[in-house]
């Protein structure tokens, strides 16, 4: 976890969920029948938490978008709005969740391991929550003006 950055609580929650899912997925792959319910519950719980985080992030971004230029790539993938260490940490959690989900579902198709495919929504939702709460975005130009130095594709890459 990157030291000295804002949003440590979100980073810790993201990695805790990723670690819990990884542990449950590994055990479910080895013991598919007794772990079917825990795998489904863990996967659906992380999906629900990720969806809630995504909706909260979207609502916060709507409020901030009155004054700042916020893009989807910046909000959910932290492109240009977060320090590199935060972006790498959150995207590493997303990549790990995706890899574990695909591996578990590939090894044990047609079992509860397939529920794991839903889990990457968790890391993506928490990335959005971090971006909405702590992300730095360029200011929105005054109404009716389009200055040449405002590039909406820049999306805060000055961070």
Feature locations, PLM:
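Hydrophobic core segments of alpha-helical transmembrane domains
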Residues: 48-58, 123-131
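Hydrophobic, membrane-facing alpha-helical anchors
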Residues: 1-5, 66-75
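Long, highly hydrophobic alpha-helical transmembrane signal-anchor segments
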Residues: 2-49, 90-93, 98-106
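Cytosolic-side membrane-entry/anchor segment at the start of a transmembrane helix
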Residues: 1-22, 132-159
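Hydrophobic alpha-helical transmembrane segments and immediately flanking/interface helices
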Residues: 103-135
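Short membrane-interface loop/juxtamembrane segments of multi-pass integral membrane proteins
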Residues: 70-96
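Membrane-water interface of transmembrane alpha-helices
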Residues: 52-72
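Juxtamembrane transmembrane-helix termini
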Residues: 31-35, 60-67, 107, 111, ...
């Amino acid at each position: 976890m990157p030291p000295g950055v804002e949003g440590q609580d979100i980073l810790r929650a993201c990695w805790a969920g990723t670690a819990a899912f990884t542990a449950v997925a590994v055990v479910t792959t080895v013991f598919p029948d007794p772990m079917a319910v825990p795998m489904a519950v863990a996967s659906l719980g992380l999906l629900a938490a990720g969806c809630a985080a995504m909706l909260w992030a979207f609502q916060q971004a709507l409020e901030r978008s009155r004054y700042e230029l916020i893009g989807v790539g910046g909000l959910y993938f932290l492109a240009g709005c977060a320090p590199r260490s935060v972006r790498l940490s959150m995207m590493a959690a997303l990549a790990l969740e995706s890899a574990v989900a695909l591996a578990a579902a590939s090894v044990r198709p047609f079992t509860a391991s397939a529920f794991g495919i839903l889990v990457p929504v968790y890391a993506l939702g928490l990335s959005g929550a971090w971006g909405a709460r702590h992300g730095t975005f360029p200011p929105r130009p005054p109404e009716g003006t389009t200055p040449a130095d405002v590039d909406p594709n820049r999306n805060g890459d000055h961070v």
